[in-house]
Design a protein with these regions (language model features):
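Intrinsic low-complexity, intrinsically disordered or marginally ordered coil/linker segments
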Residues: 1-214
Length: 214
């Protein structure tokens, strides 16, 4: 089984285009038009979106790529969560979006944590920042008794994506260290030299997102 890459996409466009995109997903997932691939036998396969627009799916990399969630985020933004083998399948998804409206603008974040793969095209940090942060209670009782669960909730919060400035501010307060450079702090945290879960009960991981223009 290939490593699973999770991709989150926000697609911006005109209200009418977002509605058309939502209809395409609805009709594809339900196989309303009976156009879905019979061999693949999974209506959530992204190749079916291409088939429903009269496009040839095997022109693109659609390997083990499936829609998990989708919907209208608001009148001008559509949301997609998908899983695929190894990496994001944005060439195929771009073809889907272009088939509805070539002026639609997708922003995506792809994560394959086993390979330390964190990639986004969101250069503007509109949806996805410079860093991806995840934390959890490795030892709940210790996290509570040490007071670090409360501090982590207050200073790191439930956010997943941070700009460099936001992250530096949070870590300076969390670690009582306003002087060490951000990259060095992140290295120490990920190596468990700083904020060690054996002392805090909290497992904290910080990953820099590679920004691409494609």
């Amino acid at each position: 089984m290939a490593n699973i890459c999770t991709t989150t996409i926000y697609v911006e466009g005109e209200k009418e285009s977002v509605e058309k995109l939502n209809t395409l997903f609805d009709e594809t997932i339900s196989n309303k038009n009976n156009l879905n691939d019979k061999v693949n036998d999974n209506n959530t396969w992204i190749g079916n979106l291409l088939l429903n627009k009269g496009l040839f799916p095997y022109k693109y990399d659609t390997h083990r790529a499936f829609v998990c969630e989708y919907g209208e985020e608001n009148d001008t933004t559509f949301y997609v969560l998908m899983e695929s083998a190894w990496d994001e399948k944005m060439e195929a998804m771009d073809a889907v979006f272009d088939s509805v409206d070539k002026n639609m603008k997708p922003y995506y974040f792809a994560e394959e944590c086993a390979m330390e793969y964190y990639v986004s095209n969101d250069i503007e940090n509109k949806y996805f920042g410079d860093y991806y942060v995840d934390w959890f209670e490795e030892d709940y009782d210790l996290a509570v008794s040490s007071g670090e669960l409360k501090r982590c909730r207050e200073l790191v919060g439930d956010e997943t994506f941070y700009t460099a400035k936001e992250l530096r501010s949070s870590l300076a307060k969390l670690l009582h260290d306003p002087f060490t450079k951000l990259d060095k702090l992140i290295e120490k945290i990920n190596d468990r030299e700083e904020y060690n879960p054996e002392k805090t009960g909290i497992s904290l991981g910080i990953h820099k997102i590679k920004k691409v223009t494609k």
